[in-house]
């Protein structure tokens, strides 16, 4: 009996050439594509393309709301930016994709799962770590990695097997996109001294071409998650789409960086994440207003670990669950509205309010006659605050001269 294999399918070059390759190995291929909000994607065409190049069946799963509510929302609450700027665009969708692929594999009595990742990328680890966690007995095929294709060889193989090739050898970008953003690599971008050309960007205008007048928006959060845009309640997936357009039109969300990959190499990545740039900036600003100081100062330690765990394929782990429980606890008070100014590549918080959770007390902060802060208590506080270092210094005189006594 012919074995069935479930392929994580995107419609792109890597996963399209995987279909005839897997068929040559004797598998019946079931292509599965997840709709996680890929901009401008024609899922009917993608589904048909898989069938045209030889898949036994082609399945489309609409997972946009699931992706936003269960994968994007946690990274918003955790301010998760890998190496300080990358909002984990591709890394976020991988465990969700595998969760659905494993379910479909079980339903279809498939014995294997395939992906189109290369041996140099992070996604091979993310896909296979999730498969091992969810079903250790499931076989794994990785044709692009295991056959050692170069990009040029892959294009030639595609043409030999009648797989449509929408790119050329001179500019073979590799693009991955979802609700949360767009990742672009390869081609001219592989030389870090080459500036990203205009055609490398797909969700944003250049900041120079953005409108000369700023756009102002209000983002309302409930327990750390945005729930309304300009006072209009909406699902998170819908809001992200709206903000991708608004922020993208203002040139916001471009990231051009050298990134440390999980597999140990540095890579040049070009990302666009317009909605993420706005939401993350607004969320961080609201935390400044609502989080107690010690919590606010300690939280980045947990955020950094969570961010690295997501990037490094450790979403499915007890430590990740425990750390997210801490994050969720902190977000109970992150309720309020932030006014954002979108202008020529910048998303800036210009006002904020929280009716029930603001820790800002104007009477304490003011320098006017309405000041209620007890300034006379400051001298005693300072003396007690510095007592440990004062005693140490007077005993050891590391930074001071010892007084001579007669």
Curated annotation (Swiss-Prot):
Signal peptide: none annotated. Pathway: Amino-acid biosynthesis; L-arginine biosynthesis; L-arginine from L-ornithine and carbamoyl phosphate: step 2/3. Coiled coil: none annotated. Keywords: Amino-acid biosynthesis, Arginine biosynthesis, ATP-binding, Cytoplasm, Ligase, Nucleotide-binding. It catalyses: L-citrulline + L-aspartate + ATP = 2-(N(omega)-L-arginino)succinate + AMP + diphosphate + H(+). It comes from the Bacteria. It is an enzyme of class 6 (ligase). ATP binds at residues 8-16, 116. Pfam families: Arginosuc_syn_C, Arginosuc_synth. L-citrulline binds at residues 86, 122, 126, 174, 259, 271. One of its GO terms (biological process) is argininosuccinate metabolic process. Belongs to the argininosuccinate synthase family. Type 1 subfamily. Homotetramer. This is Argininosuccinate synthase. It comes from Lacticaseibacillus paracasei (strain ATCC 334 / BCRC 17002 / CCUG 31169 / CIP 107868 / KCTC 3260 / NRRL B-441) (Lactobacillus paracasei). The gene is argG.
């Amino acid at each position: 009996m012919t074995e069935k294999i479930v392929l994580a399918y995107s419609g792109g070059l890597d996963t399209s050439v995987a279909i005839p390759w897997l068929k040559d190995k004797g598998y019946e291929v079931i292509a599965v594509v997840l709709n996680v909000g890929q901009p401008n994607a024609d899922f009917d065409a993608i589904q048909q393309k898989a069938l045209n190049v030889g898949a036994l069946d082609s399945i489309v799963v609409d997972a946009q709301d699931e992706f936003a509510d269960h994968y994007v929302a946690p990274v918003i609450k955790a301010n998760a930016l890998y190496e300080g700027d990358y909002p984990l665009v591709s890394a976020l969708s991988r465990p969700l994709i595998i969760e659905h692929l494993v379910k479909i594999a079980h339903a279809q009595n498939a014995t294997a799962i395939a992906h189109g990742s290369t041996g140099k990328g992070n996604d091979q680890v993310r896909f296979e770590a999730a498969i091992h966690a969810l079903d250790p007995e499931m076989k794994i095929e990785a044709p692009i990695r295991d056959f050692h294709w170069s990009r040029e060889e892959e294009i030639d193989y595609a043409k030999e097997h009648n797989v449509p090739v929408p790119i050329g050898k001179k500019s073979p970008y590799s693009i991955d996109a979802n609700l949360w953003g767009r990742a672009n690599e390869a081609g001219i971008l592989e030389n870090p001294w080459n500036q990203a050309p205009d055609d490398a960007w797909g969700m944003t205008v250049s900041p120079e071409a953005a409108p000369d007048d700023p756009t102002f928006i209000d983002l309302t959060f409930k327990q750390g998650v945005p729930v309304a845009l300009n006072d209009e309640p909406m699902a998170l997936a819908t809001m992200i789409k709206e903000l991708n357009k608004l922020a993208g039109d203002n040139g916001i969300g471009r990231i051009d960086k050298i990134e440390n990959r999980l597999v140990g190499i540095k890579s040049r990545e070009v990302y666009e994440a317009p909605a993420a740039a706005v939401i993350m900036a607004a969320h961080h600003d609201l935390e400044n207003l609502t989080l107690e100081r010690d919590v606010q100062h300690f939280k980045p330690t947990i955020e950094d670990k969570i961010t690295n765990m997501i990037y490094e394929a450790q979403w499915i782990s007890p430590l990740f669950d425990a750390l997210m429980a801490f994050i969720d606890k902190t977000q109970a008070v992150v309720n309020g509205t932030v006014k954002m100014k979108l202008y020529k590549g910048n998303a800036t918080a210009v006002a904020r309010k929280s009716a029930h959770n603001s820790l800002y007390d104007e009477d304490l902060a003011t320098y006017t006659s309405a000041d209620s802060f007890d300034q006379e208590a400051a001298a005693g506080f300072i003396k007690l605050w510095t007592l440990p270092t004062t005693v140490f210094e007077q005993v050891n005189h590391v930074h001071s001269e010892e007084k001579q006594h007669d």
